[in-house]
From Swiss-Prot:
Cofactor(s) this protein requires: Zn(2+)
GO cellular component, one term: ribosome
InterPro entries assigned: Ribosomal_bL36 (IPR000473), Ribosomal_bL36_sp (IPR035977)
Entry's cofactor comment: Binds 1 zinc ion per subunit.
Record-linked Pfam families: Ribosomal_L36
Organism for this UniProt entry: Thermus thermophilus (strain ATCC 27634 / DSM 579 / HB8)
GO molecular function, one term: metal ion binding
One GO term (biological process): translation
Domain of life (superkingdom): Bacteria
Membership in a protein family: Belongs to the bacterial ribosomal protein bL36 family.
Protein known as: Large ribosomal subunit protein bL36
Residues given in the record as Zn(2+) binding sites: 11, 14, 27, 32
Amino acid sequence: MKVRASVKRICDKCKVIRRHGRVYVICENPKHKQRQG
């Protein structure tokens, strides 16, 4: 899980999702997981 000021989709399989007021990127590739913080 990378914590970043700006989250971006890295590949076509990445999805941007809002949970509990936070922005997440989830993907098949675990390296692409991100959270906005």
